[in-house]
Design a protein with these regions (language model features):
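Glycine-rich phosphate-binding loops that contact phosphosugars or nucleotide phosphates
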Residues: 24, 28-150
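A short, well-structured juxtamembrane/interface segment
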Residues: 1-16
Length: 151
């Protein structure tokens, strides 16, 4: 696995009561998976758009802008993207004065708090983003369950 510098990022998750996550493509799947697991393992209210919401909210336009109207009610909004100049980072910039934000991305963003995952491929990034969010949970004291055959 890649060496990821978590710095102050666990404290963002720790202090948030509600978390909104978003991403594109495989990163949207990571966001949906993590919204479920953060809720299940921490008791925090977490949500991410599903494919029905992304197409219904967006219509012929950009779904991320419409969805952020919901996300801005969260204490923390996490965006997961493989490009630091994307619709995901633009959406985070729109709400960063209303709530705490965290961009998970391979490169540092010029104005967003960025957790850098130095991946070389899309798939490596998606898998490492998922693993990194589990590490954030462990850093705030969450005990993640073992596989059943290991118990």
């Amino acid at each position: 696995m890649l060496d990821i510098d978590l710095r102050h990022f666990p404290s963002k998750l720790h202090k948030a009561r509600s978390v909104a996550l978003l991403g594109n493509g495989g990163n949207l799947a990571v966001a949906q998976h993590m919204a479920s697991d953060i809720t299940r393992h921490t008791g925090k209210f977490c949500y991410a758009p599903d494919s029905v919401h992304t197409t219904a909210l967006g219509g012929d336009g950009d779904w991320k802008i419409a969805w952020m109207q919901y996300a801005e009610f969260a204490d923390l909004v996490i965006g997961i993207t493989c490009r630091n100049c994307s619709g995901i980072s633009n959406a985070l910039m729109e709400v960063q004065d209303k709530c705490d934000t965290l961009l998970i991305c391979p490169q540092q963003h010029k104005s967003l708090d960025t957790l850098i995952i130095p991946a070389k491929t899309y798939h490596e990034f998606e898998c490492t983003a998922l693993w990194t969010i589990y590490r954030l949970m462990e850093h705030i004291g969450v005990e993640l369950p073992d596989l059943p055959h290991l118990q």
